[in-house]
Amino acid sequence: MSSLVRKIISTAKAPAAIGPYSQAVLVDRTIYISGQLGMDPASGQLVPGGVAEEAKQALTNIGEILKAAGCDFTNVVKATVLLADINDFSTVNDVYKQYFQSSFPARAAYQVAALPKGGRVEIEAIAVQGPLTTASL
């Protein structure tokens, strides 16, 4: 049995990890993107403006990691949204729809007790490299 290749995906266009983890890991054609806060890559600080701005920045960061892996948002098949306040769900959805416009990935959303750096939203994603065709079952 041949072994699968594990490759670390990293880009300076997304925030550096704030703990012992990689921005993303590619195994075979699957990319596992670590949770992204609404952090500015240059300053390492949360962007001002509340949950909508944090969600935009988190998704922008995911987009840069996807680009580093040769992908874009159409390659995302699963996302997880962590919220400091579940009442922000619809606000984050409004931002989310600007990045995922059709053939939405599977997704879960949870309220958590707290997020790193006092963030209001964190988003992680799983994507698959290569062209994807959407089919109806």
From Swiss-Prot:
Entry EC number(s): 3.5.99.10, 3.1.-.-
Keyword Hydrolase: yes
Catalytic activity entry: 2-iminobutanoate + H2O = 2-oxobutanoate + NH4(+); 2-iminopropanoate + H2O = pyruvate + NH4(+)
Residues that bear N-acetylserine: 2
GO molecular function: 2-iminobutanoate deaminase activity; 2-iminopropanoate deaminase activity; deaminase activity; mRNA binding; RNA endonuclease activity, producing 3'-phosphomonoesters
Domain of life: Eukaryota
Record's subcellular location: Cytoplasm; Nucleus; Peroxisome; Mitochondrion
Catalytic EC class: hydrolase
Biological process per Gene Ontology, one example term: lipid metabolic process
Residue(s) carrying Phosphoserine: 136
N6-succinyllysine modified-residue sites: 13, 67
InterPro entries registered for this protein in UniProt: RidA, RidA_CS, RutC-like_sf, YjgF/YER057c/UK114
The keyword Nucleotide-binding belongs to this UniProt entry's keyword annotation: no
Keywords from the UniProt entry: Acetylation, Cytoplasm, Hydrolase, Lipid metabolism, Mitochondrion, Nucleus, Peroxisome, Phosphoprotein, RNA-binding
Cellular component terms per the entry's GO annotation: cytosol; mitochondrial matrix; mitochondrion; nucleus; peroxisome
Main localization, broad class: cytoplasm
Residues the record lists as Phosphothreonine modifications: 74
Family from the record: Belongs to the RutC family.
Subunit structure: Homotrimer. Interacts with YTHDF2.
Biological role stated in the UniProt entry: Catalyzes the hydrolytic deamination of enamine/imine intermediates that form during the course of normal metabolism. May facilitate the release of ammonia from these potentially toxic reactive metabolites, reducing their impact on cellular components. It may act on enamine/imine intermediates formed by several types of pyridoxal-5'-phosphate-dependent dehydratases including L-threonine dehydratase.
Protein name: 2-iminobutanoate/2-iminopropanoate deaminase
Native organism taxonomy: Eukaryota, Metazoa, Chordata, Craniata, Vertebrata
Name of the gene this protein is made from: RIDA
